Amino acid sequence: IGPEEVRYTVVTGYGRMTYQGADRQITEISCHAKGVFHLSSSARTIVDVGGQDTKVIRLGQDGSVENFVMNDKCAAGTGRFLEVMARVLDCPIASLSQLAQQGEEVVPISNLCTVFAESEVISHLSAGVSQANVAAGAIASIATRITGMAGRVGVEPQVVMTGGGALNGALVEALSKSLGHPVCILDNPQVMGA
């Protein structure tokens, strides 16, 4: 597509304020709401686990944003947390879900701070705890963190998960269990907010 073929531009995300040539700027929150509601009009709660932040968004029956909460101050509960855990566990990020699902028990990871959680994981591994059990604990800790956030806006089914975190089956399972509602994954969840 050449510049002459572009009729209208919309920017979103963290960099939206830095691009000056757009016709319109829309927040990530609104984009997630529009994208999810377009594909599933029964969606009422969106959980977005992205690389930099995690969001929980409550939708009205018309798809409007009723409330939201966002964790953008630290990496806890985000895709970055998953990346750090995968690195410490010496596991490719794409295999972290499978490793966690092989866990026979969920080893508690009590630190919400990524830096401290990393140290806690290293301690568990040094004590002989299996990688799979530690991975299960890391996934469970994210689900617990997100459930706490969701409690602040209220969870109403249908729950839809977006962002790259939605590609982690173990996280989807843990979150479904923690929220007490099935979590639905729509096509291309990692680009839903675009």
Regions found by a protein language model. Name each.
Residues 1-7, 146-157:
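Phosphate/pyrophosphate-binding loops at sites that engage ATP/ADP/AMP, CoA/4′-phosphopantetheine
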Residues 1-29, 173-184:
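N-terminal glycine/serine-rich phosphate-binding loop of ATP-dependent small-molecule kinases
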Residues 117-150, 189-192:
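Adenine-nucleotide phosphate-binding core of ATP-dependent small-molecule kinases
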Residues 14-15, 150, 155-178, 186-192:
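Glycine-rich phosphate-binding loops at beta-strand->alpha-helix junctions
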Residues 14-50, 55-62, 147, 151:
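Conserved phosphate-binding catalytic cores of ATP/NTP-utilizing and phosphoryl-transfer enzymes
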Residues 24-33, 47-51, 69-77, 136-139, ...:
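Active-site nucleophile and cofactor-binding loops and adjacent substrate-binding regions
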Residues 62-105, 190:
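Glycine-rich phosphate-binding loop plus the immediately following alpha-helix
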